[in-house]
From Swiss-Prot:
Localisation: Cytoplasm
Official protein name in the record: UDP-N-acetylglucosamine 1-carboxyvinyltransferase 1
Similarity remark: Belongs to the EPSP synthase family. MurA subfamily.
Catalytic residues identified in the record: C120
Keyword Cell cycle: yes
Encoding gene, per UniProt annotation: murA1
Enzyme class: transferase
Catalytic function, reaction form: phosphoenolpyruvate + UDP-N-acetyl-alpha-D-glucosamine = UDP-N-acetyl-3-O-(1-carboxyvinyl)-alpha-D-glucosamine + phosphate
Originating species: Streptococcus thermophilus (strain ATCC BAA-250 / LMG 18311)
Positions bound to UDP-N-acetyl-alpha-D-glucosamine: R96, R125, P126, I127, D128, L129, D309, V331
Keyword Transit peptide attributed: no
Length: 423
């Protein structure tokens, strides 16, 4: 079992960092390749992450050829032959995002069986919106013993209103609707950049998807989809994590190829704090003087609101800003587990329902801590950079799901950080 060791107290990050392709984009893109009954689909700018290997194995388990070339960050998928209709439990159980294969398998085969997914233990994160949407399109859904079986000889276009703009449900229903008879309208759809990226791929494959990035999606079904080539967008959450890292260490960092528009909700809060954030030709530059930063109030919301996947990292920034800040989590319940670990490092905080109050600017000390989920693992490492002494972060399986060589990138920026194997 690996662990990360951080020596903190005087860290000041500077330099340039390269951002990978987006984890939250590539997983549904890989699911979408299932829909291509003609030709090969090539995805470029694919990040080397454990979740990508897991999704590759989910798709491969459907008797689909998947070739991942790590040297050039490319995945080639050939789903042109007959495919199986049951996703392999061994891999689906590891990752929540694997539920997005349900819609593509059903649309392609008329029958699909997928186990309830695994992943980070953040609240209940129900999948009822996925299932209700498919039922509205004519699917019969049966849930028995942790397995979901969906049947529909041919999905029918429908008008679907989602009670909450779920990203995963929007993606699942988008993909299913591409091969349905007639027109499907999804109202109160998710608007994240990853939704737009998926719509672009689907249209490149021959689909007819309109409205991506707005609250209303209109998908006109077609008879079949074909392979294509598509570049995965940059990871806005990784970019945001390095923006926060620069801000909390009084750093000066260029986040190369980061997309300003994708990160606008986070950038607006950094600017409100007093962080200097500027768009440059090669990316986004973040400069900061922690002693001059002001506390802020943040509320996570579906895009274009502040991203829930940046909540833990922003908490780490709040910890070094003098005064009382607050952060409200409205997307997922039970997503403050990292605060208990940060308290071991001297963080003063309290939680009232869905809001955490952070008393920042007080001394932090290194400690042994454990990652509780993917983004919390990054937050603990960032906190370790500004805490006096040595911090050891364990349970790195979470980190590897969403960050590629995170410790190496931080080290190149000036952090005293290493990753070691623990017997």
């Amino acid at each position: 079992m690996d662990k990360i060791i951080v020596k903190g107290g005087n860290t000041r990050l500077s330099g340039e960092v390269v951002i990978e392709g987006a984890k939250n984009a590539v997983l549904p893109l890989l699911a979408a390749t299932i829909l291509a009954s003609e030709g090969q689909t090539t995805l470029t700018n694919v990040p080397i992450l454990s979740d990508v290997y897991t999704m590759n194995n989910v798709v491969r388990g459907l008797d689909i050829a998947v070739d991942f070339n790590e040297e050039n960050n490319t995945v080639v998928v050939d789903a042109s032959g007959e495919i199986l209709d049951q996703a392999p439990y061994e891999y689906v159980s590891k990752m929540r995002a694997s539920i997005v294969v349900l819609g593509p398998i059903l649309a392609r085969n008329g029958h699909a069986k997928v186990s309830m997914p695994g992943g980070c233990t953040i609240g209940s994160r129900p999948i009822d919106l996925h299932l209700k949407g498919l039922e509205a399109m004519g699917a019969k859904i049966i849930q028995v013993g942790g397995d979901i079986t969906a049947t529909a000889e041919k999905l029918k276009g429908a008008t679907i209103y989602m009670d909450f703009p779920s990203v995963g449900a929007t993606q699942n229903l988008m993909m299913a609707a591409t091969l349905a008879d007639g027109v499907t309208t999804i109202e109160n759809a998710a608007r994240e950049p990853e939704i737009v990226d998926l719509a672009i791929l689907l249209n490149e494959m021959g689909a007819n998807v309109k409205g991506a990035g707005t609250e209303k999606l209109v998908i006109k079904g077609v008879k079949s989809l074909h392979g294509t080539q598509h570049a995965v967008i940059q990871d806005r959450i990784e970019a945001g994590t390095f923006m926060v890292a620069a801000a909390m260490t009084s750093g000066n960092v260029l986040i190369k190829d980061a997309i300003w528009e994708h990160n606008r909700p986070l950038i607006s809060k950094l600017l409100e704090m007093g962080v200097d954030v500027k768009e440059e030709d090669r990316g986004i530059r973040v400069k900061s003087d922690v002693s001059k930063l002001k506390p802020v109030a943040v509320k996570t919301l579906p895009h274009p609101g502040f991203p829930t996947d940046m909540q833990a990292q922003f908490t780490a920034l709040m910890a070094v800003v003098k005064g009382k800040s607050s952060i409200s989590e409205t997307v997922f319940e039970n997503r403050f587990q990292h605060l208990e670990e940060m308290r071991r490092m001297g963080l003063h905080s309290e939680i009232l329902r869905d809001t955490a109050m952070i008393h920042g600017g007080l001394p932090l000390q290194g400690a042994r801590v454990m990652s509780t989920d993917l983004r919390a693992s990054a937050a603990l490492i960032l906190t370790g950079m500004v805490a006096e002494g040595t911090t050891t972060v364990g349970k790195l399986t979470h980190l590897d799901r969403g960050y590629y060589k995170f410790h190496e990138k931080l080290a190149k920026l000036g952090a005293q950080i290493s990753r070691v194997s623990e017997a």
